[in-house]
């Protein structure tokens, strides 16, 4: 067996679109940029393309490293590359930074052509369906009429699912990992707490903080801390941190004492240093609004009737943010419609973030699934 390798040094590309993009919120984006990366080679038949959809804080940088920043490794580098589950010797892999993002695609930090200033909070609300429409236009630009597969975890899984409903004829296979057909009330509640942390930060300035030369770092830090708790499992937090005290004994202060406090503050500070608060607000609302069954009276069976792809649905036993029960809802609806679907529930202790990790059972499953896809 070939030893897995990195795709090596990569470089992002930018596609500009002049054609207005109608949005589900009622607005229109007159023109926009999408930043993307590709790995592997598109075959002569243009039949080996795989789209990887990112989650809330992800980006187009799925695999490889940048020449000027070799420590910036793609967020799914353990999965994508020669000899890896998503093998770039076989597939042409595409990663896209979605609209509203903060990694180069048009978003709140971009200039609003109507005002000459950053969009800020005036950037229109975007939905998963809008993202998929924009991705489809990029596929057209690249000459890809049909994807061999579309894959994503968490919010990325929602995009993969939406692709099979919006463009069923353009998707051969879909992998929906650690995802759900819609958010629960509890999930929406977590997102709202995170948003309020940002919205009430004095440096938020109604979303126009760019013009003030500040960022709502305190709010974004707290939002990330709240979110990060939900990405981990109780068992994994207990095993990694337990009740360990940084100083060996209690010092009775509001400063950092427990190791888990130190970890959360570190993650929050790091996130606030590179992510955009408006993008966070926008993307959590995108999550909240996703509900393909809504226009079918809440009937998921009816909503998924349009799908024709072969599916892989994956959940993780300790994921309480998007529990296995939510994945099974998708599976049951697909089976009701007599679609080809494989389901796996992976026993992994890491919680929701398991879909990002190098779990042997998980990767073996994905390798076998991708191996069976004919291009």
Curated annotation (Swiss-Prot):
Site (Important for acyl-CoA specificity): 321
Annotated residues for binding of substrate: 224, 353
GO cellular component: cytoplasm
Keyword line: Acyltransferase, Amino-acid biosynthesis, Cytoplasm, Methionine biosynthesis, Transferase
Lineage: superkingdom: Bacteria
GO-annotated molecular function: homoserine O-acetyltransferase activity; homoserine O-succinyltransferase activity
Main localisation: cytoplasm
Residue numbers annotated as active site: 154, 319, 352
Top enzyme class: transferase
Pathway where it operates: Amino-acid biosynthesis; L-methionine biosynthesis via de novo pathway; O-succinyl-L-homoserine from L-homoserine: step 1/1
InterPro entries: AB_hydrolase_1, AB_hydrolase_fold, HAT_MetX-like
GO biological process: homoserine metabolic process; methionine biosynthetic process
Compartments, record wording: Cytoplasm
Catalyzed reactions: L-homoserine + succinyl-CoA = O-succinyl-L-homoserine + CoA
The protein's Enzyme Commission number: 2.3.1.46
AB hydrolase-1 domain segment(s): 48-358
Family indicated by similarity: Belongs to the AB hydrolase superfamily. MetX family.
Function: Transfers a succinyl group from succinyl-CoA to L-homoserine, forming succinyl-L-homoserine.
Subunit architecture: Homodimer.
PANTHER family for this protein: HOMOSERINE O-ACETYLTRANSFERASE (PTHR32268:SF11)
Protein name: Homoserine O-succinyltransferase
Lineage of the species this protein comes from: Bacteria, Pseudomonadati, Pseudomonadota, Betaproteobacteria, Rhodocyclales
């Amino acid at each position: 067996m070939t030893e897995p390798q990195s795709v090596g040094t990569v470089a992002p590309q930018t596609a500009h679109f002049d054609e207005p993009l109608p949005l589900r919120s009622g607005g229109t984006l007159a023109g926009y940029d999408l930043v993307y990366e590709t790995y592997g080679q598109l075959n002569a038949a243009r039949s080996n393309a795989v789209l990887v959809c990112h989650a809330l804080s992800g980006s187009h940088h799925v695999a490889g490293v940048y020449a000027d920043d070799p420590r910036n490794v793609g967020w799914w580098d353990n999965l994508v590359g020669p000899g890896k589950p998503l093998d770039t010797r076989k597939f042409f892999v595409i990663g896209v930074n979605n609209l509203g993002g903060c990694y180069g695609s048009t978003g709140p930090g971009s200039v609003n052509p109507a005002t000459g200033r950053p969009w800020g909070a005036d950037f229109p609300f975007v939905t998963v369906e809008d993202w998929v429409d924009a991705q489809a236009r990029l596929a057209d630009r690249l000459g890809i009429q049909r994807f061999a597969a579309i894959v994503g975890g968490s919010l990325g899984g929602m995009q993969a699912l939406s692709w099979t409903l919006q463009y069923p004829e353009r998707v051969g296979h879909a992998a929906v990992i650690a995802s759900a057909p819609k958010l629960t009330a509890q999930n929406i509640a977590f997102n709202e707490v995170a948003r309020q942390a940002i919205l009430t930060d004095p440096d938020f300035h109604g979303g126009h903080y760019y013009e003030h030369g500040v960022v709502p770092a305190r709010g974004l830090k707290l939002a990330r801390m709240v979110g990060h708790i939900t990405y981990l499992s109780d068992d994994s937090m207990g095993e990694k941190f337990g009740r360990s005290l940084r100083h060996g004994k209690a010092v009775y202060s509001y400063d950092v004492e427990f190791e888990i406090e130190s970890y959360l503050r570190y993650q929050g500070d790091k996130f606030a240093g590179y992510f955009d608060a408006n993008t966070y607000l926008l993307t959590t609302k995108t999550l909240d609004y996703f509900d393909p069954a809504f226009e079918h009276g809440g009937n998921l069976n009816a909503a998924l009737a349009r799908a024709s792809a072969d599916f892989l649905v994956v959940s993780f036993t300790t994921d309480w943010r998007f529990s296995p029960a939510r994945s099974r809802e998708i599976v049951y609806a697909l089976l009701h419609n007599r679609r080809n679907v494989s389901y796996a529930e992976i026993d992994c202790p890491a919680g929701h973030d398991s879909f990002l990790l190098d779990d042997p059972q998980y990767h073996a499953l994905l390798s076998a699934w991708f191996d069976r896809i004919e291009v």
